[in-house]
Amino acid sequence: HADETIEVSAIRELEEETGWTAEHAEVLLIGPTSSGSSNEKIAFVRATGLRKVGEGGGDGDEDITVHEVPRAQAAAWLTAKMSEGYELDAKLWAGLWMIEHHLDGRPRG
């Protein structure tokens, strides 16, 4: 998959891992996962035009449980999971904010 754009890769991974595909993917931000400690980078991508096409769950050696949570309930669902003792990646919160806001803080319309 070395020739793929970030957008194409994001849509492919979305489908493999969740069973959903997207008509469009927009790169919102690319940055380091751990500044100064690694050269690894993460891309935050906003997918739109979603539709269910399969079961998801990953491929081969991946063991992914898919949770389908409506966007409007995502923050409450994540908060409930934390109160149940789950440790969640902080990037989830950044991603939720970025899909609803431009980087300068303006709401997406």
Feature roles, as predicted:
Residues 1-12, 16, 50, 58-60, ...:
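Conserved Nudix-box catalytic region and its N-terminal flanking loop in Nudix hydrolases
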Residues 2, 35-38, 43, 60-109:
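Nudix hydrolase/Nudix homology domain
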Residues 6-8, 27-30, 45, 53, ...:
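Extended aliphatic helical segments
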Residues 11, 25-26, 75, 95:
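Generic N-terminal initiation segments characterized by hydrophobic and/or small/turn-forming residues
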Residues 15, 19-53, 80-82:
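Active-site segment of metal-dependent pyrophosphate-handling enzymes
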